[in-house]
């Protein structure tokens, strides 16, 4: 049985790999990055890297999902706030701006990721994107109905 400490250590190693990969992707470009470079930047051997990820695409997808998860965790409280649509929309946009500013490398990666996504992974990206757009659209529509957003 795996104890909590071991689980935490595995998660920390995985996160360290993702941070190393993000740096290499940013420095060298996604297409030119190799698993060797990711392993080296994260401070692990290739065997450890392949224990956690079977391919560069898997690393890419996990970074993308981590970025979206961080964004959602940051704006979720604003989405459920019981305030008017105008204040809610402005609050979400401000929070997103703060999150993006605090981790520029992650979000430069995240916003350029669609250029590199394999066809098999496009739906994952699209799901996150559509969810964000749907929430923002519903807030705007509510604001228009309540006459908080006008021409």
Please tell me what each predicted stretch does.
Residues 21, 43-53:
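Short hydrophobic/aromatic patch on the recognition helix
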Residues 62, 76-102:
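Hydrophobic alpha-helical connector segments
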Residues 69, 76, 120-146:
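Amphipathic alpha-helical packing segments from all-alpha helical-bundle domains
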Residues 10, 18, 60, 64, ...:
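Amphipathic, non-transmembrane alpha-helical scaffold segments
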């Amino acid at each position: 049985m795996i104890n909590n400490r071991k689980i935490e250590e595995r998660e920390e190693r995985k996160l360290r790999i993702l941070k190393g990969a993000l740096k290499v992707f940013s420095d060298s470009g996604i297409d030119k990055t190799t698993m060797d470079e990711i392993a080296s930047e994260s401070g692990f051997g290739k065997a450890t890297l392949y224990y956690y990820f079977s391919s560069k695409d898997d690393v890419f997808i996990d970074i993308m999902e981590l970025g979206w998860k961080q964004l959602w965790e940051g704006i979720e409280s604003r989405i459920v706030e019981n305030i008017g649509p105008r204040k809610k929309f402005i609050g979400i946009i401000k929070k997103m701006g703060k999150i993006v500013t605090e981790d520029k490398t992650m979000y430069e990666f995240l916003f350029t990721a669609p250029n590199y996504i394999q066809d098999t992974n496009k739906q994952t990206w699209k799901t996150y994107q559509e969810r964000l757009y749907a929430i923002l659209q519903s807030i705007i529509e509510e604001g228009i109905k309540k006459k908080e957003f006008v021409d």
